[in-house]
From Swiss-Prot:
It comes from Xylella fastidiosa (strain M12). This is Phosphatidylserine decarboxylase proenzyme. It is found in: Cell membrane. Its EC number is 4.1.1.65. GO terms for molecular function: phosphatidylserine decarboxylase activity. Is synthesized initially as an inactive proenzyme. Formation of the active enzyme involves a self-maturation process in which the active site pyruvoyl group is generated from an internal serine residue via an autocatalytic post-translational modification. Two non-identical subunits are generated from the proenzyme in this reaction, and the pyruvate is formed at the N-terminus of the alpha chain, which is derived from the carboxyl end of the proenzyme. Binds 1 pyruvoyl group covalently per subunit. Keywords: Cell membrane, Decarboxylase, Lipid biosynthesis, Lipid metabolism, Lyase, Membrane, Phospholipid biosynthesis, Phospholipid metabolism, Pyruvate, Zymogen.
Length: 293
């Protein structure tokens, strides 16, 4: 474990993230513009894809970071039996959920039960599939629906706020099952589906289209919200949530329904709307990419 990763164990995660939230919403022209210009230069942000390409037009750093895209700049895969990539970013890992465990990095894994905070809910994804997508600071930070789904419930699982960058993922055991996260359960035409919005160091908030700001407030116990009977349906490719700084979204899929798109591997760059998985034909067996051991 390198020095920087070791240092992250000692940092006051929530205090730093709360401070980041205040700074992100600051509208002082010199402060917000310095932050925006610094991130654009450091991470090579492509503002030509943004609905507002003028870096000086954003009232705050958060408005810049959660910017919308130009209409038509991302399009969904036209096949209705194709599950869509929920975000721009890079594949951290993907593959089968083997013996209830989700692969994180070489020598690292965690259980679906740990991730979801619910043994019964995790059982629906035994032998299913997962995909972990990392959104870097340069990426579009809104998360969209892979397919049309009816919101059933959310689970706010408290935890740490480690960085979710590539080095941290390789070195911090069970990282995604330790960080604060919002677990969103959906019922779809293909069966159950979960999207997990994972918080991280300096992530100043997670917002959903149905509930607004969900994180913070940071929690000390698991909190459930039941949405059954509320008729909250979100269409395929529609926005469902956003991060107020870079982080990670994890998709869980049920067994024997999909096969992951064969071109996807760990570290693949991905864009919102491209194929994540294809529905299996009745006589087709599930296939999954090879993972590192």
């Amino acid at each position: 474990m390198n020095f920087v990763t070791t240092l992250t164990y000692l940092l006051p995660h929530r205090m730093l993230s709360s401070l980041a939230r205040h700074i992100a919403y600051c509208q002082h022209p010199l402060i917000k513009q310095w932050l925006i210009d610094t991130v654009i230069a450091k991470f090579d942000v492509n503002l030509s894809e943004a609905a507002e390409p003028d870096a000086h037009a954003y009232p705050s750093f958060n408005a810049f970071f959660t910017r919308s895209l130009k209409a038509g700049i991302r399009l969904p895969d036209p096949n209705p039996d194709t599950l869509l990539m929920p975000a721009d970013g890079r594949i951290s890992q993907l593959g089968p959920i083997r013996e209830g465990r989700i692969f994180q990095a070489k020598g690292q894994s965690f259980t679906a039960t740990e991730l979801l905070g619910d043994t019964a809910a995790a059982s629906a994804f035994t032998n299913g599939l997962f995909a972990t997508v990392y959104l870097s600071p340069r990426d579009y930070h809104r998360v969209h629906m892979p397919c049309t789904g009816q919101l059933l419930k959310t689970v706010h699982v408290p935890g740490r706020l480690f960085s979710v960058g590539p080095d941290a993922v390789r070195q911090i055991p069970r990282l995604f099952a330790r960080n604060e996260r919002l677990v969103c359960h959906f019922d779809t035409a293909f069966g159950p589906m979960v999207l997990v919005m994972v918080g991280a160091l300096l992530v100043s908030g997670v917002e959903t289209v149905w509930g607004g700001v969900e994180i913070p407030a940071y929690g000390d116990r698991i909190t459930h919200k039941d949405y059954q009977g509320r008729n909250i349906a979100i269409e395929r490719f529609a926005e469902m949530a956003r991060f107020n700084y870079g982080s990670t979204v994890i998709v869980l899929l049920p067994p024997n329904v999909f096969t992951l798109a064969p071109h996807l591997t760990a570290e693949s760059p991905v864009t919102l709307g491209q194929a994540l998985a294809h529905r299996l034909s009745l006589n087709h067996s599930t296939q999954a990419p090879t993972q590192e051991k």
